[in-house]
Amino acid sequence: MIRVFNTLGRRKEVFNPYSPPLVGMYVCGPTVYDYTHIGHARTFTVFDAIKRYLRLRGYDVFHVQNITDIDDKIINRAREEGRDWREIVREYSRDYLEGLGSLGIQIDHHPRVTDHISDIIRFIEGLIEKGYAYVAESGSVYFEVDKYPGYGMLSGHLSKEAWRQEEDVLHEKKSPYDFALWKAAKPGEPSWESPWGRGRPGWHIECSVMSSRYLGSRIDIHGGGVDLVFPHHENERAQSESYFGHRWVRYWLHASYLTIKGEKMSKSLGNIIPLREALREWGPGPLRLWLLSSHYRSNLDYSEEALGQYRRLYERLRQAADSIGRRLERAEPKGRLGEGELETVERLKGVVRRWHEAMSDDFNMGKAMSSLWEFTTIYFREVEQTESYTLLWLSWRILTGFNSVYAFAPDIVEARRPERSLEDSLVQALVDVRSELRRRKMYDLADEIRSRLAQLGFVLHDKGEKTEWRRR
C-alpha cells in the first residue's frame, strides 16, 4: 500500500488512482525565459522518480510536463535583449530539454502553450457559457472567483487579502480577486485571434487546458514546486472544476525548495546555479542521487560536501555493478546455501524491505536513500568475495531495481547486464594474458598492458595471483 501526502487536505491518503493501473500525472514545467537551474531540476527529478517508483510497483504512468512558451517573463526578456520572443523560447527550451536528457528524466509528452491556443479559447468559451467567466471592455476575459465556493482550500489562503492579483487591471474586474483567462493584446506583443479580439492566454488557463487535453477530465497526480500552490494551482483547480463540474485532481503533490545556506535561490541574492554548470561539475549520476537525497516535501540545501558524498555513493554503486557483472559470468549455481550466505540473503532482503517501506510512505526518498548505502556495505563486505551465484544474482536484481527509480546510471541495465559483451571478453582476455606474464615475471609487458587499459578507462587491481578489473 502506498500513501501520499495530498496538499488538498494536508494529510496522507492511500494512493488509489481513478482507473488503476493507469495513472495520469501532470507536472508544471518551466517558463522558458532563462536557463534551467538546479532548483527546477530538483522538482523535475523528484517527479521523475515518483513516476519510476509507481511503474516499479506495477502502475502504468503517463507523465505530461508542459513548456510555457508565451508569458510576460518571455516578452520582457525579449524586450530587454532586443530579440524576437521566439528566439528566447528556442534558446531556453533547448537548454531545458538538454538538461532533462542529461539527468535521465523521461517525459511522455511535452505540450507547448502556443500549440494549444484553439484548445484554450474553447475552454474559456465553456467557462463563459457556464457563468464562471466574463469579458471586460478591453477584450480580456476574467474568471469570477466568487462563483467558485472552494477557492482557497488548496493553498489554505481562505482570507481574501491573500488573493489580490494583477493590480494594473483592477478597474475592469468585477472583483479585485478575479484572475485573467485571456489577456487583451498590447502593442508590440505577440497575440492571437479570438472571439474577444486579439490577445494571449493567461498563465493559469494554459495548464488546465494542456493537462486535460492529454489526461482527461480526471487527473490522478498534479505536481509542481511548492511555490506554485498559490496562486497557480489554486486558480487551475478553480477554473477546471468549474468547467468539468466535478473533482478534477485526486492528489496534489508539491516539492519543496532547494536552498543555498538556508536561503532560497534568487537572482537578487546572486546564488542561482544553472543546471548545465552543476552537470559539468558533478556529472548526472551523483547530481541525481543528491537531488533525491531528502524527502521531497523538505528543503534540500546545496553544499559541495553533500554532493561529494553522493559522488562517492555513485562510484560505489558503479563499482558494485561492474563487480557483480564480472562475477556472475564465472559463478555457477550450486545447491543449498551455507548458513552465512543465508544470513546475507536475509540482510539483503531487509534492505529492500526498508527501501519499499520508505518509498511507500509518501515517497520518503531521504529515508530510502540509506538503503543504497547499506546495500553497498553488505555487497563489498559479504557478497563480493563469495562467488555465490545466488547472492550475486540477488545483488544484481536489487541494484537494477534501485537504478530503475534513481536512474543514476542509465547504461547499467543494458551495458552491465550479466551476459558478457564483446568488449568485456576482450578486456578479460588481456587481463588473463597479463596474469600469465606476471607469472613468468615479465613485468614490463604486464605493466604496459595495465597502462594501456587504464588509458581506455579500465582499472586493474592485483589481489595475490588474481587480477580484477573495473571501468573507471
Swiss-Prot record:
Amino acids binding ATP: 267
Enzyme Commission code: 6.1.1.16
Keywords, alphabetical: Aminoacyl-tRNA synthetase, ATP-binding, Cytoplasm, Ligase, Metal-binding, Nucleotide-binding, Protein biosynthesis, Zinc
Keyword ATP-binding carried by entry: yes
Note on cofactor: Binds 1 zinc ion per subunit.
Family as reported in the entry's similarity comment: Belongs to the class-I aminoacyl-tRNA synthetase family.
PANTHER family linked: CYSTEINE--TRNA LIGASE, CYTOPLASMIC, CYSTEINYL-TRNA SYNTHETASE
Cofactors demanded by this protein: Zn(2+)
GO cellular component: cytoplasm
A single BP term in Gene Ontology: cysteinyl-tRNA aminoacylation
Record-given protein name: Cysteine--tRNA ligase
Primary site of residence: cytoplasm
Motif ('KMSKS' region): 264-268
InterPro entries: Cys-tRNA-ligase (IPR015803), Cys-tRNA/MSH_ligase (IPR024909), CysS_C (IPR056411), Rossmann-like_a/b/a_fold (IPR014729), tRNA-synt_1_cat_dom (IPR032678), tRNAsynth_Ia_anticodon-bd (IPR009080)
